[in-house]
Amino acid sequence: MNLHEYQGKQLFKEYGLPVSEGYAADTAQGAVEAADRIGGEEWVVKCQVHAGGRGKAGGVKLVKNKDDIRAFAENWLGKNLVTFQTDENGQPVSKILVESCTDIANELYLGAVVDRTTRRVVFMASTEGGVEIETVAEETPEKILKAEIDPIVGPQPYQAREMAFALGLSGVQIKQFTQIFLGLAKMFEELDVALIEINPLVIKTDGNLHCLDAKVGIDGNALYRQPKLKDMQDPSQEDAREAHAAQWELNYVALDGNVGCMVNGAGLAMGTMDIVNLHGGKPANFLDVGGGATKERVAEAFKIILSDDNVKAVLVNIFGGIVRCDMIAEGIIGAVKEVGVEVPVVVRLEGTNAELGREVLANSGLDIIAAESLTDAAQKVVAAAEGK
């Protein structure tokens, strides 16, 4: 789950990190009032969306009067911002962040992520701030510094100091960098963070370090123990189908193909997508209904798949271990009747009560295509999607 910049900076402030004074507003008048609270003669206004590249798309602007703040807010609120990280539809802008200006002498990068290979949190820093870190990693990987956090002893000040020296910091800057490093590490652990980026972490003209941006991603699997963070979720920034699926505890990821897939188990779901590809099809989604799927969840999963207009056929691939195939069959029948399915549906059932499940489907009177094997299912659904 991603947070907006203003939300990330609120958390930074709670953990003692230096951030600009700023307030988020959802109206043009609110944006002007935010500037009044901040004071001064110059401000930065930023569209709040879950995507990078806002500046190049016109979503970040330096303004010198409140009329420009009002005009910026009126122009963007309620519209979609399209950047190189969004699709052609962009992301809806429902809030504008108004901040005080910062005089910048230099830009750095500081981030932290879970390295699944080493199974540790890894901090990364670079002198190439304000640039996409992926670009730096590809073109000049030697400019990225790394520090692994030992889960037993935790983050150590010496790791921050080594990084600070390598970044060319000196004097009080090293102490400030160490405080930021340790604050981020504490926040990462306590809030179940999956990703943090400060890009750029700037050196101001007065020599002090300052967090000019905040990108924070929370581990969605840990939200049950982070109620405060769960309340920060902005469903408008997510794929509508994915957000709907999450409410039903369904693991759904939208793709760009035309074969809808409903499977129980993440591994089987990926294998199903692979075999659909192998036979010339393109999956429209990843959808894992889970081992404890109920009839209601299966019906809801069907609705979510069919809400994608690109879907020309649906493949249901169920291995009955914990879940019973006859229950899945009843869910399929219920969904087909309720939604009014107009595309071919191919079903492959194996495992617990598979024979009973196939019997339930056969006696339903619905035009459902039965498959004897996974290969057979893939061939049939690809052919059906092509109208053969």
Swiss-Prot record:
Keywords: ATP-binding, Ligase, Magnesium, Metal-binding, Nucleotide-binding, Tricarboxylic acid cycle. One of its GO terms (molecular function) is magnesium ion binding. GO terms for biological process: succinyl-CoA metabolic process; tricarboxylic acid cycle. It comes from Alteromonas mediterranea (strain DSM 17117 / CIP 110805 / LMG 28347 / Deep ecotype). Residues 9-244 form the ATP-grasp domain. This is Succinate--CoA ligase [ADP-forming] subunit beta. Succinyl-CoA synthetase functions in the citric acid cycle (TCA), coupling the hydrolysis of succinyl-CoA to the synthesis of either ATP or GTP and thus represents the only step of substrate-level phosphorylation in the TCA. The beta subunit provides nucleotide specificity of the enzyme and binds the substrate succinate, while the binding sites for coenzyme A and phosphate are found in the alpha subunit. Belongs to the succinate/malate CoA ligase beta subunit family. GO terms for cellular component: cytosol; succinate-CoA ligase complex.
